[in-house]
């Protein structure tokens, strides 16, 4: 069982986005999240890196995202871990916190399904079937904000909630992790786009989304200082992601997951640098 989280109700920051806003506003919203999450003392190829997940402690570093279906609405609040960008909960209009990991968030109600794409879609390959766009974002926000306790017993309502969570994961969480995804979504929100423009990610982006840790590790390996007389490690191409060079990896990632790689920063050292640079 998960250790109960701390500080879910005391976010490090809150980022707000109005679903009707422009693609430029969306880009600013996502860039702002990356900027606030990064370890100020750690970059890879000029890309920000998250501080490490602290070992053996319950998650205690959180941020909130508030998504408003209209400028005057109260908005749907998402609770997201600041160390790995995992979506763990959302708050419906009746004040209920719904959690995706049973027993993680104090006082929350388990939504009835987990937050992995296997839980949500049955198969990670189905990510390429998920339609994204302004209408989908609005529908997702409306569905989760309007959720009631009775919905958990309804098959159709549970399916609607699964689809809504998947939409938000791609348009917020994966968009924060990947410049490719945020660029794709920004294109769908472009004011010149047809009013109801939607799109689906392709196979390369699907592989990226499913391989954030692998891609982060591959880029971090190229940062390791080589022994005297040796040249730095070359980037190992990841063909299914369409990423063949370190430069392409840096252009794909929005922020790296911290991964310990041989000869690189340790968890302890990265945390020390994070705290020394004012990280909370």
From Swiss-Prot:
Localisation: Cytoplasm
Pfam families, per the entry: RIP
Top-level taxon in the UniProt lineage: Eukaryota
Active site: 174
InterPro entries xref list: Ribosome-inact_prot_sf, Ribosome_inactivat_1/2, Ribosome_inactivat_prot, Ribosome_inactivat_prot_CS, Ribosome_inactivat_prot_sub1, Ribosome_inactivat_prot_sub2
Top EC class of this enzyme: hydrolase
GO biological process, one term: killing of cells of another organism
Any one GO molecular function term: toxin activity
N-acetylalanine: modified positions: 1
Keywords of this entry: Acetylation, Antimicrobial, Cytoplasm, Fungicide, Hydrolase, Plant defense, Protein synthesis inhibitor, Toxin
Reactions listed under catalytic activity: Endohydrolysis of the N-glycosidic bond at one specific adenosine on the 28S rRNA
Entry GO CC: cytoplasm
Predominant cellular place of this UniProt entry's protein: cytoplasm
UniProt-listed PROSITE patterns: SHIGA_RICIN (PS00275)
EC number, UniProt record: 3.2.2.22
Sequence similarity: Belongs to the ribosome-inactivating protein family. Type 1 RIP subfamily.
Other observations noted: Three similar RIP 30 isoforms I, II, and III have been described in Barley.
Function, in words: Inhibits the elongation phase of protein synthesis. It inactivates fungal ribosomes even more effectively than mammalian ribosomes and is thought to function as a constitutive antifungal agent in plants.
Protein name in the entry: Protein synthesis inhibitor II
Species assigned in the record: Hordeum vulgare (Barley)
């Amino acid at each position: 069982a998960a250790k109960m989280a701390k500080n879910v109700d005391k976010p490090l920051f809150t980022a707000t986005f109005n679903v009707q806003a422009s693609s430029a506003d969306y880009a600013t919203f996502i860039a702002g999240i990356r900027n606030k999450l990064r370890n100020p003392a750690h970059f890879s190829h000029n890309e920000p890196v998250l501080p490490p997940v602290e070992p053996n402690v319950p998650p205690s570093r959180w941020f909130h995202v508030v998504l408003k279906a209209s400028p005057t609405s109260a908005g749907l609040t998402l609770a997201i871990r600041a160390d790995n960008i995992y979506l763990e909960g959302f708050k419906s209009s009746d004040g209920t916190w719904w959690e995706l990991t049973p027993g993680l968030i104090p006082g929350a109600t388990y939504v009835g399904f987990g937050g992995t794409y296997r839980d949500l879609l049955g198969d990670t390959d189905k990510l390429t079937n998920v339609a994204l766009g302004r209408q989908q974002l609005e529908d997702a926000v409306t569905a989760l904000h309007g959720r009631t306790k009775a919905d958990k017993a309804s098959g159709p309502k549970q399916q609607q909630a699964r689809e809504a969570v998947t939409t938000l994961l791609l348009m917020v969480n994966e968009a924060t992790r990947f410049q490719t995804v945020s660029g794709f979504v920004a294109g769908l929100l472009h004011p010149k786009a047809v009013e109801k423009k939607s799109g689906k990610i392709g196979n390369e982006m699907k592989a990226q989304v499913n391989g954030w840790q692998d891609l982060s590790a591959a880029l971090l390996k190229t940062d390791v200082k080589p022994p005297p007389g040796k040249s730095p490690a070359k980037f190992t191409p990841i063909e299914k992601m369409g990423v063949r060079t370190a430069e392409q990896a840096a252009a794909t990632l929005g922020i790296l997951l911290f991964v310990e790689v041989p000869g690189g920063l340790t968890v302890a050292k990265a945390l020390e640098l994070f705290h020394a640079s004012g990280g909370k």
